[in-house]
Amino acid sequence: HVLDGVTPMELWRDYGLTSYNMATSSETLGMTEQILKLSAQTHKPKLAVIDVYYIDKPDDLEWTYSYRHLFFDAVPLSFAKFDAVRASLPQNEWLEFMMPFSLYHSRWEELLSGQSARLVDCEPFMMGSEMRIGRGAPLAYTRTHEMTADELPGEAALRRIIAYCRANDIEPVLMALPAPVSEQEQMNMNRAQLLADELNVPFLNLFDEETGIDFETDCYDYLGHMNPDGAAKL
């Protein structure tokens, strides 16, 4: 949801903030940790905003592995990249992510011709965000402020992310973007408030902010990914 909901160029235009959207699709918090560490080697931010949508997901979800190419394929070969791949993927996946040409070697003609489908609609001037036009009928939605009682799989990674930020003079901020998700998914994200209070970290729970978001008009699909109208409101 962050790919579509946070537009760096609007932050620059409206507030003079320079930023980059480093989000990927189906991103576990363990993967977020590795993205932050590798990105900070190129440019250390003053502030890192961490989305908590997948706070309930463990890092070893096999169906999320393919999405990790969105980040790792752009990272040059290095010991740091190997450490990140090793920390976030099982050993049988390491070669594919360290040497991605083994995955694409039969597709060069398709890629060079420009006929291949793009997984992310992102241009350089969009600073990592994507823009998808359209409107989709959202899922049924009822707001809840309850919290999941038990600790969730992503909390350990969140703690490590916050510790890394503080050790490297980066201000950590947690965030939940509004979407027509189930009450259980909301309860999971609401639980991030407990961690934020414990560690004295800001938590922007935009489900409760007066953003003016209308899921009927501001989403391009039923899952609540924002179209440009929705992203502008966030």
List the predicted regions and their residue ranges.
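Acidic-and-aromatic substrate-binding clefts and catalytic sites of carbohydrate-active enzymes
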Residues: 26-30, 149-154, 180-188
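A generic structural signal for well-ordered alpha-helical segments
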Residues: 12, 165, 195-196
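C-terminal regions of proteins
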Residues: 187-234
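Acidic/histidine-rich helix-loop elements
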Residues: 19-24, 146, 150, 223
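Secreted/periplasmic serine-hydrolase-like ester/acetyl group-modifying domain
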Residues: 65-170
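Loop/turn elements at helix/coil->beta-strand transitions in domains of secreted/extracellular proteins
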Residues: 16-18, 44-47, 166-173, 199-202
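Membrane-embedded segments
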Residues: 2-84
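Active-site-proximal beta-strand/loop segments in catalytic clefts of secreted hydrolases
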Residues: 22-25, 51-53, 175-179, 206-209
